[in-house]
A protein has these predicted regions:
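Short loop/edge segments at beta-strand edges and connector loops
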Residues: 17-20, 25-26, 136, 164-168, ...
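A conserved FAD-binding loop/helix module that cradles the flavin
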Residues: 105-107, 233-285
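FAD-binding core/adjacent interface of flavoenzyme oxidoreductases
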Residues: 13-112, 116-125, 192
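C-terminal, flexible cofactor-proximal segment of oxidoreductases
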Residues: 259-333
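A cross-taxonomic marker for long C-terminal extensions/tails that follow the last structured domain
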Residues: 45, 148-221
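FAD-site-proximal beta/loop scaffold in flavoenzymes
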Residues: 62-87, 185-190, 194-255
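Rossmann-like dinucleotide-binding cores of NAD(P)H-dependent redox enzymes
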Residues: 1, 102-168
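N-terminal Rossmann-like dinucleotide/flavin-binding domain of flavoprotein oxidoreductases
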Residues: 1-42, 145-163
Length: 333
């Protein structure tokens, strides 16, 4: 699913400038672009630049991600098809961590790709020609989803004959595999890896208050205190809250964006994003899905055979068309 920015701008009445930010001076409310243009004179600036990835030696050269440039996802498909033409191979799927901010881990998409590839190969009657391995540096990957979900995920790995290598720090990536801190090498013909996030590099010189992981520190209204008219949302902002399961997800970013728009227009009736902090996703596995939800008061993982896959595809259609104003948004979404 993709939404052209020009179409989005036309639907909602804002101008689109396609350029790269070279620097941001929050005090001066000045943004310098790679083209040399300067954006200044604005009363409000909302920082929604996403984040950068924690770098590991060889990651750029020897891995592909579905949480990066769109071209990487296309290349992943191309290289998988090449291995199919070759007759088989060893595939590795994993994600990384950031001990400075656990909310920046992207685990769900890695599981989705892995299980979808498993079912793709199974449909083509080639699953026995491939070795699939899941890897991650933490001892209990997926535990944010809560204990029962973690156990269910482990069972799914066993049922689909997917090996795992967990609990060991990733030292480097090579053209033919992954090296771990204990010296062991996981051999791989194709490695899909989603690195954990860290604050965007541009923010380092912005003079804004940053967390240890480099994210902008805001209050619950996404205001940067001490910087009037500056807001940070989504992956650019540090998530507040003491719970260790919180995660940076798209629906939380949307709540932040909606709240900031409301708060700018209604300064005496501000909305907080704190009560909306939860984990919510439909994890597509190719022949079905799993509904995952966790909050301070509830945690569940519900299998959705067959229908779950189509629910996920349907959500993509709804998401695109509702954002373009072609259909109404569902209440609360």
């Amino acid at each position: 699913m993709s939404v052209p920015l020009d179409d989005l701008g036309e639907a909602h009445g804002f101008d689109v400038i396609v350029d790269e930010v070279s620097s941001l001076d929050a005090k001066a409310k000045s943004v310098i672009l790679k083209s040399g243009a300067t954006l200044e004179g604005f009363d409000k600036i909302i920082i929604a630049m996403g984040h950068h990835k924690v770098q590991i030696k060889g990651m750029k050269e020897h891995t592909l991600s579905i949480c990066g440039a769109p071209e990487e996802a296309v290349e992943l498909h191309t290289r998988l098809d090449a291995l199919i033409q070759k007759g088989g191979g060893k595939l590795a799927f994993g994600f990384g961590g950031n001990p400075k901010d656990r909310s920046s881990v992207r685990g769900g998409p890695a599981f989705e790709v892995m299980f979808n590839v498993h079912n793709y190969l199974k449909k083509r009657k080639l699953r026995d020609k491939f070795e699939l391995t899941f890897f991650a540096p933490m001892q209990r990957p997926g535990e944010k989803m809560e204990e029962k979900a973690h156990v269910m995920m482990d069972k799914m790995l066993g049922m689909t004959n997917i090996d795992k290598k967990i609990g060991k720090k990733i030292v480097s990536f090579e053209s033919d595999g992954i090296i771990f801190e204990d010296g062991e090498k996981l051999v791989s013909d194709l490695t899909m890896f989603i690195s954990a996030g860290k604050g965007h590099n541009i923010l380092e010189s912005s003079k804004l208050p940053l967390s240890e992981a480099g994210y902008v520190v805001t209050n619950e209204y996404n205001e940067v205190e001490g910087f009037e008219g500056i807001y940070a949302i989504g992956d650019s902002a540090m998530l507040l809250g003491e719970n260790d399961w919180k995660a940076k997800q798209g629906h939380v970013a949307e709540v932040m964006a909606r709240n900031v728009a409301h708060n700018i227009l209604n300064p005496d009736d501000k909305l907080s994003y704190i009560d909306h902090l939860n984990i919510l996703c439909v994890m597509d596995i190719g022949n079905g899905a799993a509904f995952v939800y966790r909050s301070n008061t509830s945690a569940k993982m519900i299998p959705l055979p067959i229908i779950g896959h189509w629910m996920k595809k349907g959500w993509g259609w709804y998401c695109k068309n509702s954002k373009l104003g072609r259909i109404p948004r569902l209440p609360g979404l």
